[in-house]
Each structure stands twice: as C-alpha cells, then as structure tokens.
Amino acid sequence: MIRKGFVMQVNPDCHAEYKKRHDEIFPELVEELKSHGAHHYSIFLDKQRNLLFGYVEIENEQRWNDVAKTAACRKWWAFMRDVMPSNPDNSPVSQELEQVFYLD
C-alpha cells in the first residue's frame, strides 16, 4: 500500500457543516473511492487553524488520480465548494505531504 498524507483548509465558520456533510457522504462516492483502491481514509480537523489533515492508503497512484475524473467526485467537489477553499475546477485546494517517519 502507498500511504498518502495531505492538508486542506476549511472555512472558519464551517467546521460543523464540514463534519455533517462527511457524516452523510454520498454512497456513490464511497463506492468510487473503494473501487479505485482507497483504504483507511481519514480526515482530521485542527479547529484552531482551520486545518484538515487527510490520510489514505492507496493501491496505485494512477487509480487514485482517476477518482478525480468520476462524476461522483466532481459532484462532491461542487457540493463542498462553499465550505472550503477550492480551485476553479471545484477541487479542494490541497497540499500533499512528504512522509518523514513510519512505524509498522
């Protein structure tokens, strides 16, 4: 498995809404993520900095990147655009992190 870490931001007044939307995540998005090889996907919130830390294990970089091409993902991005900084294509502004330590 390939471990991926990344950070995003959530708007300061949208913490509860961000969580609520993820509690009610689109079932079709869950299926797309799983079918594209995503496992152990978690997102953590640092409320003081409005920072989101994402962690996911993937089977293959290409399959992971292909999730962004799915209708379910595009629909989710559009749905989330008002609660977080987003790019012109509605994808969340994110920064991939470099792994500097791992303990198995």
Swiss-Prot record:
Main location, first listed in the record: cytoplasm
Keyword match Cytoplasm: yes
First-level EC class: isomerase
Catalytic function, reaction form: alpha-L-rhamnose = beta-L-rhamnose
Binding site residues for substrate: Y18, Y41, W76, W77
GO cellular component, one term: cytoplasm
Pathway: Carbohydrate metabolism; L-rhamnose metabolism
Keyword entries, A-Z: Carbohydrate metabolism, Cytoplasm, Isomerase, Rhamnose metabolism
One BP annotation, GO: rhamnose catabolic process
EC number annotated for this UniProt entry: 5.1.3.32
Residues at the catalytic site: H22
The UniProt record lists the keyword Cytoplasm: yes
Places the protein is found: Cytoplasm
GO molecular function, one term: L-rhamnose mutarotase activity
Protein family: Belongs to the rhamnose mutarotase family.
Subunit structure: Homodimer.
Protein purpose: Involved in the anomeric conversion of L-rhamnose.
Protein name as annotated: L-rhamnose mutarotase
Lineage, broadest ranks: Bacteria, Pseudomonadati, Pseudomonadota, Gammaproteobacteria, Pasteurellales
Gene coding for it: rhaM
